[in-house]
Amino acid sequence: MAASQAVEEMRSRVVLGEFGVRNVHTTDFPGNYSGYDDAWDQDRFEKNFRVDVVHMDENSLEFDMVGIDAAIANAFRRILLAEVPTMAVEKVLVYNNTSIVQDEILAHRLGLIPIHADPRLFEYRNQGDEEGTEIDTLQFRLQVRCTRNPHAAKDSSDPNELYVNHKVYTRHMTWIPLGNQADLFPEGTIRPVHDDILIAQLRPGQEIDLLMHCVKGIGKDHAKFSPVATASYRLLPDITLLEPVEGEAAEELSRCFSPGVIEVQEVQGKKVARVANPRLDTFSREIFRNEKLKKVVRLARVRDHYIFSVESTGVLPPDVLVSEAIKVLMGKCRRFLDELDAVQMD
């Protein structure tokens, strides 16, 4: 029985010890364990696999993906980072720039501004095309000139009072429709995601006048096309108390973990510790600094339970980004199967 439990732990748990981590590699492949049928089976996979949405708001999404291998989870994360397309500034035509910011630095800053535009409604620009069209390009104009405020107090030293337009923000970017874009996109839908991103600072007489072309691209080509601010995953924590912890030791145990992980209850007049919500733990391993309590707790992670956190830049809602990443992954699988079929035919 003990041997069976040890094997099951090796197969399903990554165990964190005081001086190292055990069972870090996936070992449940066919033939590795006697008495276990680890051959891949689609029906069994469909039965065990699930996705649970834990939290979603305008720009962030947390969900659990259960029943998959680390390779698939990481492929999904990499697709979110680098292969879901967005629109971003690609070309900057500078007519006049007398600010302290050099042209190339200014163009780089503009490229990193997230653009609120659905990339699914646009095509990739053909390589070598210099002039954009309404199906592959968005055009923005930025024209700001700094002047002195004639109504400012004489003894004022506040730039906000002394100067007009001395800070250039993304709100100064004006969308210029190409072709029939004005009919396709209502006013206000094509814009920078945030209107308060500082681009440059000016002083009286300085001016920025330029034209921007936004095109469709992916983060694999340049980070400015990445649709997510963060896309990460972690394994679900699994915390087990190996023996009862009571009295002051229970309070001490709860302080060794993140708030909400260990709960102290009153049972028959005694304080008793129990694991309330291991999901909240950050695995600081503070428990191993306590000589009395480190032997009564087992810290582990569930090998096939991934907690995904996706934070959108605001270009698209996070649930849309996840669905688009799934489509990209499915497309990769189809191409792989097509390649296999082509090899078999040859």
Swiss-Prot record:
Can you tell which superkingdom this protein's organism belongs to?
Eukaryota
MF annotations from Gene Ontology:
DNA binding; DNA-directed RNA polymerase activity; protein dimerization activity
Tell me which InterPro entries the record gives: DNA-dir_RNA_pol_30-40kDasu_CS (IPR001514), DNA-dir_RNA_pol_insert (IPR011262), DNA-dir_RNA_pol_RpoA/D/Rpb3 (IPR011263), RBP11-like (IPR036603), RNAP_Rpo3/Rpb3/RPAC1 (IPR022842), RNAPI/III_AC40 (IPR033901), RNApol_insert_sf (IPR036643), Rpo3/RPB3_RNA_Pol_subunit (IPR050518)
GO BP annotations listed: transcription by RNA polymerase I
Which positions bear Phosphoserine?
A: 4
Localization terms from the record: Nucleus; Nucleus, Nucleolus; Cytoplasm, Cytosol
Q: What is the effect of changing residue 279 to Q?
A: In TCS3; no effect on localization to the nucleus; no effect on association with RNA polymerase I and RNA polymerase III complexes
Effect upon mutating residue 32 to I: In HLD11; decreased localization to the nucleus and retained in the cytoplasm; loss of association with RNA polymerase III-transcribed genes; decreased association with RNA polymerase III complex; probably prevents RNA polymerase III complex assembly and activity
Q: Does the keyword Cytoplasm apply?
A: yes
Entry's Gene Ontology cellular component terms: cytoplasm; cytosol; fibrillar center; nucleoplasm; nucleus; RNA polymerase I complex; RNA polymerase III complex
Task: Tell me which residues bear N-acetylalanine.
Answer: 2
Which keywords fit this entry according to its UniProt record?
A: Acetylation, Cytoplasm, Disease variant, DNA-directed RNA polymerase, Leukodystrophy, Nucleus, Phosphoprotein, Transcription
Question: What job does the chain carry out?
Answer: DNA-dependent RNA polymerase catalyzes the transcription of DNA into RNA using the four ribonucleoside triphosphates as substrates. Common component of RNA polymerases I and III which synthesize ribosomal RNA precursors and short non-coding RNAs including 5S rRNA, snRNAs, tRNAs and miRNAs, respectively. POLR1C/RPAC1 is part of the polymerase core and may function as a clamp element that moves to open and close the cleft.
Q: Give the record's disease field.
A: Treacher Collins syndrome 3: A form of Treacher Collins syndrome, a disorder of craniofacial development. Treacher Collins syndrome is characterized by a combination of bilateral downward slanting of the palpebral fissures, colobomas of the lower eyelids with a paucity of eyelashes medial to the defect, hypoplasia of the facial bones, cleft palate, malformation of the external ears, atresia of the external auditory canals, and bilateral conductive hearing loss. Leukodystrophy, hypomyelinating, 11: An autosomal recessive neurologic disorder characterized by brain hypomyelination, delayed psychomotor development, intellectual disability, tremor and other neurologic symptoms. Some patients may additionally manifest non-neurologic features, particularly dental abnormalities and hypogonadotropic hypogonadism.
The subunit structure is: Component of the RNA polymerase I and RNA polymerase III complexes consisting of at least 13 and 17 subunits, respectively. Pol I complex consists of a ten-subunit catalytic core composed of POLR1A/RPA1, POLR1B/RPA2, POLR1C/RPAC1, POLR1D/RPAC2, POLR1H/RPA12, POLR2E/RPABC1, POLR2F/RPABC2, POLR2H/RPABC3, POLR2K/RPABC4 and POLR2L/RPABC5; a mobile stalk subunit POLR1F/RPA43 protruding from the core and additional subunits homologous to general transcription factors POLR1E/RPA49 and POLR1G/RPA34.
Q: Which family does it belong to?
A: Belongs to the archaeal Rpo3/eukaryotic RPB3 RNA polymerase subunit family.
Instruction: Report what the protein is called.
Output: DNA-directed RNA polymerases I and III subunit RPAC1
